[in-house]
Amino acid sequence: MEHLQGALRTYTWGSRTLLADLRGTASPAPNPEAELWFGAHPAAPSTIDGRGLDERIADDPRAALGERVVDTFGEQLPFLLKLLAAGAPLSLQAHPSKEQACAGFEREEDSGLDLHDPRRNYKDPNHKPELIVALTPFQALAGFRPFTRTAELLEVLDAPGLNRYTAMVDPADEEASLRALFTTLVSLPRKAAVALVEEVEHKARVLVESRPARLADWMHDVLAMYLELVEAYPGDIGALAALLLNYFNLQPGEALYLDAGQLHAYQHGLGVEIMANSDNVLRGGLTSKHVDVPELVRVLKFSALTSPRPQTQPNATGEEFLLPIEDFRLSRHRLSAEATLKVETDGPAIVLCTSGEAEGSAPGGATCALRPGEAVWIPASDPRPEFRARQGGQAELFYASV
């Protein structure tokens, strides 16, 4: 059991206050702080005493990961745990399946495109299912809304320039229709795209400001989000995705699980995110980074996503999120001096503190203290530690394992 130094990522959409306030560092921070990575991804591995976790694992993979994990996933940690702080909307994006990632990575490797080239879509051959758990109110767009519901919104919006495209949707073949509609919109020439975005912006602004009785609350929230996206990315056709995707306003402790091919864009808030150990992102707009619409469309799932909220299973101090994959497990725990967390997996684990102060102790005398934003690495070969809140207080921990 050793302290794990997270790798800070300073993307433009990050927040100057969310991570800083959680960690107790200078706030506002000098630059937007977007993510704090706890894992062994080679793009930004966490460190232990200045040495990358990926290197530590490579020294003795079976001791670090355990026989079961190595036999199933190879000699790499199969998950990446993050703190994610969105101060501005993230890009409109999706992630490939394992099969798609392997093929895409091999294709780009064979083409000679450098791994660090900004045009690169596939940074590794891994899929990237992900779970986000809100620590603050957290807004997100995720998965296509059933089009019967979207049709209600478009009827109230009544934007003629948009209606000419949405008329192509056939309720009898919603999936194929959504594919055609989305592909058409994100492929519009720049001039036509800007004109359409501005027309919808005008219509949306009138509705949001006047709030007529026919505008349901959920419609108001979607249109308000659209206006925010247009303000952040003027003329970006990706903003129109807000009209097609489910809108979620998560409260602390609530979560979303997104499998491969699910279109999404996180908007605002602080959360704990866990995913397969990948940095593959296919973008369709709302970003200054590389956008590859044909590749994004190729991996997208256009069926409606009706239930991205994962089920949970209560445990002694919180709950575990029940997920349909083997790459990672995540549970949330609220501790006191009496209510403790015992790490029992036969594989590796990372324990992250998000509030209060906690202390861990293991057979043999190893101890550690955790404050918000701090984590410990527990290799498979180490004695199994137990965590409790310090000094009679309370603490919240997230326990990631395989």
Residue ranges of predicted features:
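Generic C-terminus detector
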Residues: 88, 357-402
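Transition-metal
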Residues: 1-213, 288-306, 330
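Short acidic-glycine-tyrosine-enriched beta hairpin
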Residues: 247-258, 262-266, 272, 362-383
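Conserved short histidine dyad/triad with adjacent acidic residue
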Residues: 314-316, 326-345, 372, 381
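Short beta-strand segments in beta-sandwich/barrel cores
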Residues: 255, 339-341, 356-361
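A short beta-loop-beta micro-motif enriched in histidine and acidic residues
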Residues: 31-33, 76-77, 87, 126-128, ...
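A short hydrophobic beta-strand segment most commonly corresponding to one strand
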Residues: 90, 131-137, 269-288, 328, ...
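C-terminal, non-catalytic macromolecule-binding modules
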Residues: 269-320
